[in-house]
Amino acid sequence: MGFENIWFSHPRKYGQGSRSCRSCANKHGIIRKYGLNICRQCFREYASDIGFKKLD
């Protein structure tokens, strides 16, 4: 039994481990609202490109 078989043998169908950022593959701080599926760091970087505007 190799290393890969031990740690990644459990199916990841739901929960935090099943989702990752679509631009950087990070698993922490995912924004799923409106189907974005990007982490909060990438959201700050790409928010204006996506069409979000900062309100004062």
UniProtKB/Swiss-Prot annotation:
Its cofactor is Zn(2+). One of its GO terms (biological process) is cytoplasmic translation. GO terms for cellular component: cytosolic small ribosomal subunit; ribosome; rough endoplasmic reticulum. The keyword Cytoplasm applies. Binds 1 zinc ion per subunit. InterPro entries: Ribosomal_uS14, Ribosomal_uS14_CS, RIbosomal_uS14_euk_arc, Ribosomal_uS14_sf. The keyword DNA-binding does not apply. PROSITE patterns: RIBOSOMAL_S14. Keywords: Cytoplasm, Endoplasmic reticulum, Metal-binding, Ribonucleoprotein, Ribosomal protein, Zinc. It is found in: Cytoplasm, Cytosol; Cytoplasm; Rough endoplasmic reticulum. GO terms for molecular function: structural constituent of ribosome; zinc ion binding. Zn(2+) binds at C21, C24, C39, C42. Pfam families: Ribosomal_S14. Belongs to the universal ribosomal protein uS14 family. Component of the 40S small ribosomal subunit. This is Small ribosomal subunit protein uS14. It comes from Lysiphlebus testaceipes.
